[in-house]
């Protein structure tokens, strides 16, 4: 089996939970006996602004696994916010329970009360296992919800800017590999035709590229074949890794760059929307040794985050698209730094983000409502 499960990844994590906890500014354990709510909110860093991160609901087998997951994800959001250059820090929340059986309106209202108790230090929204409908209930108790539908004052479908950011990531990867960023005439293997992956395939086809696709959704496959005709080839979920293509575009699962897939990959670059594509950090070095250019996922998939962050300043689609375009230049900066300093692109991306956070410390060391930073929209 090529994919590594989330539970196995968390169990294999040998780092001390206590060490991970002390990296964070604040951790809130939420328990409401009346509704059965058990949740954890982790605020990793608010140097650049209030913490921002989605809320997952999953049937974690132990509290320890839930804590490990929320600590890992909240730290990742700090880097993702820095990469997207939005004035927010990193946070995350998890609700312990089966999203198919354990949801109630009362439970999400109770969760909203815990969010409200943080007084704006943490904003959250949907993630794996939660929906917009869930947060309609939470919004009755708190104003600190983002990623709302248009009818509730939000920016709408975040997969649109996310897919656009992935497309800019592909073009930046092409620029570094081939000396030009054109999509036409090149081949892209796309894993997953969900809300984001399908739109990425559309962008590629519309600009004259060829796609090799895989997905379990037969309707999505039929639709993309109808759109692209001979520019589309369909393969199985296992075959997608061994396709001869210019760029691999993972838009489904995490952990897809691992010991098994590295043996069969036949691409020049990787740029996709899936989170945590490297099963382990050492796989970034193995990609470098194989001469495969990796566009760090948390930069590439930042378009949705940019839209969500924009909601808090008054939704402006033109501003979102302009800021999403910066993903292209950020990746070129990362690629250049990695080449210059003989390091992996993942390490170069982390260093870029750490510098942005360090620079922000000169202006703002800890977020409160009274010192909320403002975007400079003219940059």
UniProtKB/Swiss-Prot annotation:
Q: Which GO terms describe its molecular function?
A: phenylalanine dehydrogenase activity
Please provide the record's keywords in A-Z order: NAD, Oxidoreductase
Is Cell membrane among this UniProt entry's keywords? no
SMART domains documented for this protein: ELFV_dehydrog
Query: Does the record bear Oxidoreductase in its keywords?
Result: yes
Q: What residues sit in the active site?
A: 92
Where NAD(+) binds, per the record, is at: 56, 127, 158, 162, 192-198, 215-216, 252-253, 273-275
EC number in record: 1.4.1.20
Function, as annotated, reads:
Catalyzes the reversible NAD(+)-dependent oxidative deamination of L-phenylalanine to phenylpyruvate.
Which PANTHER family does this one have?
A: LEUCINE DEHYDROGENASE, VALINE DEHYDROGENASE
Q: Report what the protein is called.
A: Phenylalanine dehydrogenase
Instruction: Give the organism the record lists.
Output: Sporosarcina ureae
